[in-house]
């Protein structure tokens, strides 16, 4: 996901491998959130819910969320992404995928029409437009509805091994290279949501497991592969920025993926994601 425009280019271009990476990442984040995808206290037993997922890729989040809905067949599930290149030929049943940037503009009939608006791991790629993006997403929430935002937070406090710490540094370098101001971190998202008049604003810092730290055995290999591929693609992307990698030399980068894979299989690691939610007042 990124800013609007037909010339948007994904950092992770290999669609088949990227979908596998996203599945591993998704599984790790879900465990970190206690096995839940929706932390906002929305009543998922209600029929006819209308839900939007920004930066949806192939709609995997919405497809998994259906399992938490009591009446998914009655719900309107819409995923938007800045380009449709990752949309499958046959979308998940009950999920509609639309080419739509999260920075807007949105169709007028979408405004204040959704019970839940969700977006995950998108703001780092939007340069200095992160606050604008959040404001645009909030405009979709109906009175009494909820927004939920999920983004990486500072991982320096985690007792990770050297390879995982380097992965975190590469993520920060990617954000810097793409012009991100990172103001959404450290309470920024909560402030934006609250300043726009939303109420019942809450947040958690969810620990996302990788490799050997995953409590579910089959996730250890899945997340190891996913984050090793992430490191490989981050190296390629960051080398293209003016100034190059910065956080390591090209020589050090050559063996990082192998070192990371070994470290994840033997030691594992964690990175934190900030989950923020808020409710539009019924009279707003």
From Swiss-Prot:
Keywords: Methyltransferase, S-adenosyl-L-methionine, Transferase. It comes from the Eukaryota. GO terms for molecular function: methyltransferase activity. S-adenosyl-L-methionine binds at residues 197-198. GO terms for biological process: methylation. Its EC number is 2.1.1.-. Pathway: Mycotoxin biosynthesis. Methyltransferase; part of the gene cluster that mediates the biosynthesis of fusaridione A, a bright yellow trans-fused decalin-containing tetramic acid with antimicrobial activity. The PKS module of fsdS catalyzes the formation of the polyketide unit which is then conjugated to L-tyrosine by the condensation domain of the fsdS NRPS module. Activity of the Dieckmann cyclase domain (RED) results in release of the intermediate fusaridione A. The unstable pyrrolidinedione ring of fusaridione A is opened through a reverse-Dieckmann reaction to afford its ring-opened form. Belongs to the class I-like SAM-binding methyltransferase superfamily. Cation-independent O-methyltransferase family. This is Methyltransferase fsdD.
